Amino acid sequence: MSWRLSFRTNLLIYNVRRRNYATKAAGKPATRPNRWKSVIGLEVHAQIQTNSKLFSGAEVAFSSPINSCVSLFDASIPGTLPVLNRKCVELGVRTALALGCKVNSVSMFDRKHYFYADLPAGYQITQQRAPLARGGLLSFPVFVPGVSRKPYYKSARLHQLQLEQDSGKSLHDPVERKSLVDLNRAGVPLMELVFEPDLETGEEAAALVKELILILTRLGSCSCRMEEGALRVDANISVHKENTPLGTRTEVKNIGSVRAVAQAIEFEIERQIGILDGGGKIFNETRAWDAAGRQTIAMRDKEVVQDYRFMPEPNLPPLHVNVDGECDADVVVDAVHIGSSLPELPEETRRQIVEIHNLTPEMAIILVNDITLYNHFRTILDEPGKARSPKAVANFLINELLTILNKNKIDIEECRIPSTHLAEVTDMLEGNIINAYLARLIVQEALDGEGRESPALLAQRNDWLMITDTERIEAMCKDAIKNNPKVVEKYRKGKEKMLYALAGEIAKVSEQKVDMAKSVDLLKNMLK
């Protein structure tokens, strides 16, 4: 591909992206057609990371054989009673404090009645009247690399955080016309986090979920493995025009990934706008996200409000939590002690990266959003006896390593290249031994070899070393000037961009190994 074609192609791509994402790039929510506004509230069910269930001693293990982790209480055998798991309460309090909630000194458990085959008791034990905590605020950055030009911050109020038990799983066999029930999940401890409808776009919702995942994993209160169902998201969505009452909302249930949160919400917003613009009516219904078809599909309507017949759970006493002063921590869960041992949260880490290491907010967001990437950054930067540039390390990890991993469709968690080898590539870049193009070749070769050989050996063996010899580069510059007289003429007439066309020819001849900065300087001197 010639440099002209490449330039025109990149310009076309830029203009298309600019039209599609102009409002997001400006750091603001997208503007809807005909002044439609969307209102989004999330409910997040996070599985509490404990070894046993909320009210029984049965093991919690995702990959266990069917119905192998079921106690008598989980199966609702008459005469069995619930015993509250203290660890679940402690992790719930820990999460509430990290999110700025007010932990209630006394909370209550309730029965929520409904019938499903995988709910053998006919009710779920939850917290309706007096939850573990209320209030709270989650602030988070909204930024999509490659789409957003600039991040912006959004906040969502947390209405309440409550403890509850999960239901079992129904497995439907259409061939045999049977429904099979697995009770391994029945009684697994959950935190339900109910957010106020403060969001406007799918990207904001996805950013909230991403930030919540970062917080919960740092707290150790949830594994957040969405592929295992450890974190599930329900979205309540409505649209209305400015200065009009809120529209009828629909609920999209059990969204199973961060990207799916954005996609499902954006689809549902556009679906509702399309119906209303066509003179139709939105029904209060529950919908599901069909990832394969990339659409929401109707599950059941909610026009008739279901009566869950909430009532106090008679077999559990009020839950007392110490929220001020001293107490016997062996008897009562102590929120004061738990609050004093909270870890550094993602926003504090981002602040330090910007203020201490002088990186951009965009870089800080990308690094902190992936714990493996951030660990590589810290390991390389903190190596004893080395004084590396934080900006150089971050640039390599974000612009070179992630580019190659994305090209190979490999998650960074699966990357077998050790931090020591990544540090070596960074040093070679900083020492002008290789350039960015050669760094990518080395990373690709290291990936193919599962990181067994050092980058220095790979560079030597494949002759992937930058050409820095002045005489060699001068000879290449002379050839480029000689072979491209029309480009030279345009440059001398004032078209300065033509200089980079000549530099591109030199890069091509050298197989991208030449020191580009040096070649540009030499060309300038030769063409004076």
UniProtKB/Swiss-Prot annotation:
Catalytic activity: L-glutamyl-tRNA(Gln) + L-glutamine + ATP + H2O = L-glutaminyl-tRNA(Gln) + L-glutamate + ADP + phosphate + H(+)
EC number, UniProt record: 6.3.5.-
Organelle targeting peptide span: 1-21
InterPro entries per UniProt: Asn/Gln-tRNA_amidoTrfase_suB/E (IPR017959), Asn/Gln-tRNA_Trfase_suB/E_cat (IPR006075), Asn/Gln_amidotransferase (IPR018027), Asn/Gln_tRNA_amidoTrase-B-like (IPR003789), GatB (IPR004413), GatB_Yqey_C_2 (IPR023168), Gln_synth/guanido_kin_cat_dom (IPR014746)
Gene Ontology BP, a term: glutaminyl-tRNAGln biosynthesis via transamidation
Molecular-function GO term, any one: ATP binding
GO cellular component: glutamyl-tRNA(Gln) amidotransferase complex; mitochondrion
Highest taxon of source: Eukaryota
Subcellular location as annotated: Mitochondrion
Top enzyme class: ligase
Gene3D superfamilies the UniProt entry points to: 1.10.10.410
Purpose: Allows the formation of correctly charged Gln-tRNA(Gln) through the transamidation of misacylated Glu-tRNA(Gln) in the mitochondria. The reaction takes place in the presence of glutamine and ATP through an activated gamma-phospho-Glu-tRNA(Gln).
Subunit structure: Subunit of the heterotrimeric GatCAB amidotransferase (AdT) complex, composed of A, B and C subunits.
UniProt record similarity statement: Belongs to the GatB/GatE family. GatB subfamily.
Protein name: Glutamyl-tRNA(Gln) amidotransferase subunit B, mitochondrial
Lineage: Eukaryota, Metazoa, Ecdysozoa, Arthropoda, Hexapoda
